[in-house]
Amino acid sequence: MEFINSSSNYFLNKSTYINLRWIGIIGQFLTINIVAFIFKFEFNYILSNVIVIFGAVSNVFLINYNRSTQLSNKIAFYYLLADILQLSLLLYLTGGILNPFSVFLIIPSVFASSNLNIKTNLILILITILSISVLTLYHQELPSPLNDYKLSNYYYYSIPLGLIIALIFLNYFAILFGK
């Protein structure tokens, strides 16, 4: 892909990125299992945990694959794309855009905006917007005690709209003031 070719000017600090991913993976694992076993909400927690394990395996691979202290623009793109897809799958299984953790979907592209080139970041923004749109229309039920909640369409569609506005706003300012 021409857009994501490596550049010596754009990179991610590998150790910072790995540590942030471990925080996310541990948080996902704890949240899934607390909701499943303590709150006893019904959802596909086995598949959800498999998706989190995929994230952990990719992080171990990242630690051992690249001995450099920096991730090139291209390598960082693929890992951030994997993060967006992993979180999108988790959100699909757990309520889609109605899941309160859906706000975390914008983090990979915001993180990239101050570290990677503009073309790579635009691709990540578009993929994130696509993910938000798909999760608005297609998802499993939001786990809840009685699985009984009603939202007006105004509120329901304001969530993805707010996420997309936040994504664009935060990326704009991170690109403008990030480096």
What are these regions (language model features)?
Residues N19-F29, Y78-Q86:
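Alpha-helical transmembrane segments
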